[in-house]
Amino acid sequence: MANDNESATRGRRIFLKVAGGAAAALIGATRAHGLSANAKSATPGRGKAAESLDRSLWITWYDLPESGRDAYLAWLHKTYLPNLLRRPGYLWAAHYATRTSGGSAQIHHVDDPKVPTGFHYILIIGVTDALVFGNPIPSAIHASLPEEGRKMLALRTGERVNLMVEAGRCEGHASKAYKDGLTGAPCIQIGSFNCPVENEEEMHAGYIQQRLPAMCETASCVRTRKLNSVAGWAKHAILYEFASLEGFNRDYEAANSKSPLGTNGHSVVPMLVHAPNGPNSAIRIWPPVPKA
């Protein structure tokens, strides 16, 4: 009888061990399938699934001389940017020509000869996150270019660079119809600046509670991004993206005027110190904007 009990107990143990192993295998397979599905759904693309992937921007403001400008632009658009976008983590690039600069009379600018003053061209490169800019760093990428590429970059004057991370964004009414995915919109307004520490919370509240909603409620706004710096002179930046110049001209000032940058009707704009010649309105020259 004792042998029978012992045999039964041993049998139950074997059954439980086998059943437990099968259950663990099933759970493992299910988890692996889930991870695989999640990985596939996170693959970069041009649809809405990719909209959350470009969380860091490499922004360069600069000028160009007339001599050599056409050759530089051809090299930038046909060689430099396509090669850059083959690097891991690099998602899109947009090159802009500035239309206006300096902002309103209440805008204060930095008075420091060490801060470069270029503004006629603005190059924005979007990547997955700021870790991409750490290895290799942008200056190392430029140092490794062939001699022709280094000569082209040397044509830039007044070059100022900020590596920015996105603090947050709002999607505008024009985002659903926008066909260029993550790529910067055809018309932008961008400002980069510093703010006294004692005014930063109010400024942040002004953007979140007032300015971003006001811009994104307009018919032509694609998206608006509030940015903070990883490297560069400016600690803060704001990037408004519009589907067209016509829409920008119609909507930007109206939205700006009804959304004071502060709380309780107060504005911190007079406390901000902007980069030279900023903020800037600009139109995209690469990739070319399709004609309507």
Language-model-detected regions and their locations in the chain:
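N-terminal secretory signal peptides
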Residues: M1-I14
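N-terminal cationic leader/targeting segments used for protein routing and processing
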Residues: D4-E6, V18, A39-S41
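Hydrophobic alpha-helical segments, especially transmembrane helices
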Residues: R13-I14, V18, A32
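Sec-dependent signal peptide hydrophobic core
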Residues: A19-A23
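Hydrophobic h-region of N-terminal signal peptides that target proteins for export
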Residues: A24-A29
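Signal peptide processing junction and immediate N-terminal pro/mature segment
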Residues: R31-A42
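Macromolecular interaction modules
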Residues: K40-A292
